[in-house]
Curated annotation (Swiss-Prot):
GO terms for molecular function: structural constituent of ribosome. This is Large ribosomal subunit protein bL34. The keyword Ribosomal protein applies. InterPro entries: Ribosomal_bL34, Ribosomal_bL34_CS. It comes from Acidothermus cellulolyticus (strain ATCC 43068 / DSM 8971 / 11B). Belongs to the bacterial ribosomal protein bL34 family. HAMAP family: Ribosomal_bL34. The gene is rpmH. It holds the Pfam family Ribosomal_L34. GO terms for biological process: translation.
Length: 45
């Protein structure tokens, strides 16, 4: 039997989906802009 694929880890989560990572690329900034437009309470992880 194989283990579950999702092993939660806050540091890894922030390093891959965090605000600073998103701001690094044009596409990432677009994601944040879209979430702001939509009115998301949380923009990033």
């Amino acid at each position: 039997m194989s283990k579950r694929t999702y092993q939660p880890n806050n540091r890894r989560r922030a390093k891959t989906h965090g605000f600073r990572v998103r701001m690094r690329t044009r596409a990432g900034r677009a994601i944040i802009a879209a979430r702001r437009r939509k009115g998301r309470r949380e923009l990033t992880a």
